[in-house]
């Protein structure tokens, strides 16, 4: 299955989420479960998505001491998720140990992806936490570190895709939030791009939330987005 669309579930209740999920098709998208929904609904919710044949990106952005992160990544693998992420700013050792713990899973291991710079952050935001670099510079730095650790790819804004292809190669997966279909509200993400533009720059997977989940006819929107990037 070569779905490029990952739908970010942003519902407050299980019933709302399942109502949406039952309107869409696992052949058209994968699903992202983040901190809010996982904290509220837990592993049982992920299993329900698997029962409906959806691949799941468990977006918990682990960032802790290496042993703790590695064990959390192993738990995600045991849950059967398709992709899981951690913060590259946790360091090389943390990422290496997380990757190593997945070795026994072989081809069944989830993709391990690093978060570089959150798409809501700009130069001033980085400066305020002691990083005297532009978002692009920091993304490149952390992406190199993730590749060195053996990770499968990174989360990055669409504007960084072309540069990262040059730095990290074609086999390095680029997962891009900040995707808004033409005419959509930008919401809380500042570095945005349309699905067609993002794919044309070389993105592998597109994370899209509210333009699909809050649509009156989500299946129609999802089909239209897929058609635009075909």
Swiss-Prot record:
GO terms for cellular component: cytosol. One of its GO terms (molecular function) is orotidine-5'-phosphate decarboxylase activity. Its EC number is 4.1.1.23. It catalyses: orotidine 5'-phosphate + H(+) = UMP + CO2. The keyword Cell membrane does not apply. Pathway: Pyrimidine metabolism; UMP biosynthesis via de novo pathway; UMP from orotate: step 2/2. SMART domains: OMPdecase (SM00934). Keywords: Decarboxylase, Lyase, Pyrimidine biosynthesis. One of its GO terms (biological process) is 'de novo' UMP biosynthetic process. The keyword Lyase applies. Gene3D superfamilies: Aldolase class I. InterPro entries: Aldolase_TIM, OMPdecase, OMPdecase_AS, OMPdecase_bac, OMPdeCOase_dom, RibuloseP-bd_barrel. It comes from the Bacteria. The active site is at residue 61. Substrate binds at residues 10, 32, 59-68, 119, 180, 189, 209-210. Catalyzes the decarboxylation of orotidine 5'-monophosphate (OMP) to uridine 5'-monophosphate (UMP). Homodimer. NCBIfam families: PRK00230.1, pyrF. Belongs to the OMP decarboxylase family. Type 1 subfamily. This is Orotidine 5'-phosphate decarboxylase. It comes from Haemophilus ducreyi (strain 35000HP / ATCC 700724).
């Amino acid at each position: 299955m070569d779905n490029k669309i990952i739908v970010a579930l942003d519902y407050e209740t299980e019933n709302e989420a399942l109502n949406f999920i039952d309107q869409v098709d696992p052949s058209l998208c994968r699903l992202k479960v983040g901190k809010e929904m996982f904290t509220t609904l837990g592993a049982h919710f992920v299993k329900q998505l698997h029962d409906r044949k959806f691949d799941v990106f468990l977006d918990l952005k682990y960032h802790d001491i290496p042993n703790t992160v590695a064990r959390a990544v192993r738990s995600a693998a045991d849950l059967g998720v398709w992709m899981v992420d951690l913060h590259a700013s946790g360091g090389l050792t943390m990422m290496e140990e997380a990757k190593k713990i997945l070795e026994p899973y072989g081809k069944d291991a989830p993709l391990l992806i690093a978060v570089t710079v959150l798409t809501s952050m700009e130069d001033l935001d980085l400066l305020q936490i002691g990083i005297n670099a532009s978002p692009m510079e920091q993304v490149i730095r952390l992406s190199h570190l993730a590749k060195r650790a053996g990770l499968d790819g990174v989360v990055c804004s669409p504007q960084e895709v072309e540069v990262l292809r040059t730095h990290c190669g074609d086999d390095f997966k680029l997962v891009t939030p900040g995707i808004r279909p033409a005419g959509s509200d930008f919401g809380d993400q500042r570095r945005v791009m349309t699905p067609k533009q993002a794919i044309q720059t070389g993105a592998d997977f597109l994370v899209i939330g509210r333009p699909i989940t809050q649509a009156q006819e989500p299946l129609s929107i999802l089909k239209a987005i897929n058609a635009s990037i075909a």
